Amino acid sequence: MSSVHTSPPGPAFSSGANAGPLPAFPKETEIPVFKTTTKQLPDIPIPSALSFYYAGISSIWLWYRAPLDVLRAYVEPLGMTPYDFGGGQGAVNINFFNAVCFYGSGQPGNQGLGGFNETEINVMAYATKVAANVPSGLTLEQYLISGDPTKRIGNYRVWVACDDPVAVACGIQVFMENKFLVGYDYDIPGANNSRSGPDQFTYNWACVDTTGAEIYKAQLKLDGLSCVPGNMSEVIDLSYDKTSRRPVGSRRNYLGLFDTYLQPAVSSSVQLKYGKSENPMRHDMENVIGTSKPVAIQMYKSPTCIAEAAGYYADL
């Protein structure tokens, strides 16, 4: 497979000084920027559905090993057990993603489109009551390449940090997530954010709480790394229903394979730093991950559906 996700090179801009086929394109495009203030109005009810559909997503998973004794404290009181990937070690991941969805209804001032960014802090676990039916002996590498065929091992979402209030509300009410509102500052390669060296394969993102204090930030550099396909979908997400006191699973179908990076160099490709926020997610990240080095990286990017090229003189 290709070594890394690639973005197309920037266009060869024409100076307009020749009689070639391309108009003079600006090297930069100026766009309007608004500072907005909002006043929350009363909540409104909307129909619920048994499935939620993403129109597009760019997702990154940073995988770490963690002692089972540490992970048990997070899941055993909720009727779940951390999966043993060998050597008394379980696994956790940081899943940062950018997503967009179509709501199918819009009005002036409401485009009917939703874009949101999230971080999930996940512990790999399963419902304790089905322990006899959970496959044993899987290594983390096997899991990341082939997944769990029984789909009983899943991501228990210790925290979900999201920058969209609607997504926060739906995550809590429909999917029973431990979800809360944050902000993000990020710059990642993509089809509309092409890069030249040396940062062509560098991903940066930071998560801040509602006071502006940083919870964590990460930098990922994929230069020189090669990936193998990972058959992870469908991914099982685990939550906890406080009313019935039972673990709850939901199935997230990514319609494609994951790019999975497993080389030893992965350990030096990520810089993870914690901020000064007093948010409990920061404290839990330090507790379960701390200064550990990642052992794997996974990525999934949904395919672009339309590519529109720049204009040219059509009368030549």
Place the predicted regions along the sequence by residue.
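Aromatic- and glycine-enriched beta-alpha-beta binding-site module
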Residues: 97-211
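Interaction-surface and assembly-scaffold signal
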Residues: 3-46, 157-316
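N-terminal ordered "arm"
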Residues: 38-40, 45-98
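Generic detector of ordered, mature protein regions
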Residues: 73-79, 84, 88, 105-110, ...
